[in-house]
Every structure is written in C-alpha cells, then in structure tokens.
Amino acid sequence: MQNMVILGATGSIGASTLSVMVNNPADFHVYGLVANASVQKMLALCITHQPEYAHMVDENAAMELKSLLPNHCVTQVTTGAEALNALVTDSRTDTVMAAIVGAAGLVPTFDAVKAGKRVLLANKEALVMSGELFMHTARASGATVLPVDSEHNAIFQCLPTNVQAQLGYCDLSANGISHILLTGSGGPFLNTDLATLSAMTPAQACNHPNWSMGPKISVDSATMMNKGLEFIEARWLFNTQAEQLKVVIHPQSVIHSMVQYRDGSVIAQMGNPDMRTPIAHCMSYPQRIGAGVEPLDFFKVGQLSFCEPDFDRFPCLRLAMQACEQGQEATTVLNAANEIAVDSFLKGRIRFTDIANVNYRCLDSVQQTRLDSIEDILQLDEQARATAVSVISTLN
C-alpha cells in the first residue's frame, strides 16, 4: 500500500490520478491532497477520499475549507510553505504526484526529490527551470523520478531497463539509440490559415482535438510551446544532445512517442489519448495495473499520419529549442515569460500571436548568470515575469 500525496489535486492530472487510485484501492492510499484555492473541489475530494491532510496554498481558502469540512471528516487542513514541505517530506509519504502547473510546482517537487521520495513528474517546469540541479539532487538523494507526461512516459517505456534505471545520466549512444522521436498532435490550429491566427480566441485555443487538459496546457499545445517544454524536459531526463531529439507532428495522438535504434528499429508506445495510462504506469512501475482506459482499437483508428513541424506556424517551438541550446538561464526565462503571456491571452489582454512575441522579447533579454540553487532560479523567474509584464504593457 503506497501513501500518496497529490500536488495539484483539483486539476485534470489530479482527477485522473484519483481515478486510477479508486480502480486500485488495495494498492494506494490518499494521504495528502494539495491545491491552490479551489475550495469546493477540495471539499468534495476530502469527503470522498478522507485524506489525512488537505493543503491549500491560499490561506483564505484553507480557512474556508476548514470551516466547511463536516465533523466526521478526519482531514487536517494546512497552509503555508513549511506545512507543504512537511507533507511532501513526511516519513509516511511514499509517493508524490507532482502535478501543479507552472513554476508554483517547482519548490514542493524539488523538496520531495531532495527527501528521496518516489516522484511522479507531471510538472514540466521542474525540469525546464532546474533540470541539471533537479536530476543531480535526485541522484544524490536516491529519489525515484518517473515521467508522467504522455510523451516522456512513452519514451521511458521504449527504453532498455538499464537506461530506465539511469535517468538523467544514461548514455543513449552506448545503448544503440540514435534518436528520440517526440510526437505532438499540432493542436487545434494545425491547419488554420496563418493569416487568421491572430484572431483566435482562448476558447478556440483550448478546444484540443484529442486531449482533455487544463487551460494553460491547452494554450501551450495550440502554440506548441508544450512540445518545446517537453523537448527541454527530454534533454534532462534522457541526457540527450540536441541532434538526438526530433519533433514529429502526429495529429491522431495514438503514438505517444518513439525511440529509434541504430539497427534501424523504431519502438513506439501507442494507446488511446488518456492520461490515466501513463499515470497508472508510473504509479505501479515496474508492475502493471488497470487504468480504466479502453484498449486501442486499430480498426477504428484507421490511419496514422505524420509531418514535420512548421516553425512559421509554431514559433514558440523554435524558441524553446533555441533556449534549450542556450542553457538553463534561457529556459527559465522562457518558461516564466510564457506563463505570463498565456495568462494574459486567457484573460483577453493580448492576441494569440502575441504570445510568441512576448516570449521572444523576454528571451532576447537573457543575461548569463549562474543558477546554483533553487533560490537563484526563483529570482531569475521573478525577474523574467516582471520583464514579460513590461513587454505586454507595450502591446496594449
């Protein structure tokens, strides 16, 4: 029985994780749930799952949740950075699902890794912002890091077991691997007239053809920044060189990624586009459990298609790949700028095509600095956010 803490419990990954847990009640126990400010959602989860702890990042939300919990509920409500650190490092916490979207998830995820926990990594920003430091800390603490992102989980499943055991430090070439093929659907605007992209609305950007995701990740999919961040993640997870990574547009989202070997073989991981599959894989690794997902029906799929990414259509993807080449400072700045830009787009303050413009201008402002600690990274993140806000003010 694994005691699990879910960071981002009220989001889509949190919901999928709880669904897998309900399917496998003898194997997993909900020990702690963490959310930002969604009181009603957290209240319902506490009543249903009866966790020992419910942590709200927002202090007022924590007070409201505490007042609403029925007397029979055993859950203890906490708030504050110290309480969150105590929860993820608690000796009774076995596994941490890191699913808080954005830079907000970096510190608790890093704390869990530092404590040597089994960390199921759904938070892209942990590696985008602190990849080298993150993987070094995991190695030093003995933490187990398993990738939840469907693409990285697919790559992981296609790798030899000895490579799986050396994430962050594996030698792909020595194991006969020539390329990692990172697939992406191309999002809702894959075939949209380029001249009309500036008029696309948040609702249109969030209408993904295959996946059910939160608003921020949906917009990132529409710009393909999502794939760019995954490109950076893959660099750190699988210790790749830029020439070993390729992005492939695959609109059907059936092949979640592939590994190409020196002998000409290509191993692909396939399945219906449902996050419960990679979540269940990580939760039970190296075993397999039921995820509640319908098996892939090849007769219904019919055909699979592929194409190269168009960087005129997806400039954010190019920016992310360039930032990956520049180093950790650039990827940290790009991530921060993108979060501010996407939030502004979702609030109707900038156009869809302005997202790439904001990202480019912020990335262009990167100054070389050493990032030796989480504090250094968070300071640069804060500076980049301020720069993004300033850039956006010139667009209005």
UniProtKB/Swiss-Prot annotation:
A GO BP entry: isopentenyl diphosphate biosynthetic process, methylerythritol 4-phosphate pathway involved in terpenoid biosynthetic process
Keyword Transcription appears in the UniProt entry: no
Gene Ontology molecular function terms on file: 1-deoxy-D-xylulose-5-phosphate reductoisomerase activity; manganese ion binding; NADPH binding
InterPro entries: DXP_reductoisomerase (IPR003821), DXP_reductoisomerase_C (IPR013644), DXP_reductoisomerase_N (IPR013512), DXPR_C (IPR026877), DXPR_C_sf (IPR036169), NAD(P)-bd_dom_sf (IPR036291)
Broadest EC class assigned to this enzyme: oxidoreductase
Cofactor: Mg(2+); Mn(2+)
Binding annotation for 1-deoxy-D-xylulose 5-phosphate: K124, S150, E151, S185, H208, S221, N226, K227, E230
Catalytic activity entry: 2-C-methyl-D-erythritol 4-phosphate + NADP(+) = 1-deoxy-D-xylulose 5-phosphate + NADPH + H(+)
Top-level taxon of origin: Bacteria
Secretion signal span: none
UniProt binding sites for Mn(2+): D149, E151, E230
Claim: Mitochondrion is one of the keywords in the record: no
SUPFAM superfamilies referenced in this protein's UniProt entry, alphabetically: 1-deoxy-D-xylulose-5-phosphate reductoisomerase, C-terminal domain (SSF69055), Glyceraldehyde-3-phosphate dehydrogenase-like, C-terminal domain (SSF55347), NAD(P)-binding Rossmann-fold domains (SSF51735)
Pathway where this protein functions: Isoprenoid biosynthesis; isopentenyl diphosphate biosynthesis via DXP pathway; isopentenyl diphosphate from 1-deoxy-D-xylulose 5-phosphate: step 1/6
EC number(s) given by UniProt: 1.1.1.267
Keywords: Isoprene biosynthesis, Manganese, Metal-binding, NADP, Oxidoreductase
Residues that bind NADPH: T10, G11, S12, I13, N123, E125, G214
Annotated NCBIfam families: Dxr (TIGR00243), PRK05447.1-1 (NF003938), PRK12464.1 (NF009114)
HAMAP family (alphabetical): DXP_reductoisom
Known function: Catalyzes the NADPH-dependent rearrangement and reduction of 1-deoxy-D-xylulose-5-phosphate (DXP) to 2-C-methyl-D-erythritol 4-phosphate (MEP).
Stored PANTHER family: 1-DEOXY-D-XYLULOSE 5-PHOSPHATE REDUCTOISOMERASE, 1-DEOXY-D-XYLULOSE 5-PHOSPHATE REDUCTOISOMERASE, CHLOROPLASTIC
Family: Belongs to the DXR family.
Protein name: 1-deoxy-D-xylulose 5-phosphate reductoisomerase
Organism for this UniProt entry: Shewanella frigidimarina (strain NCIMB 400)
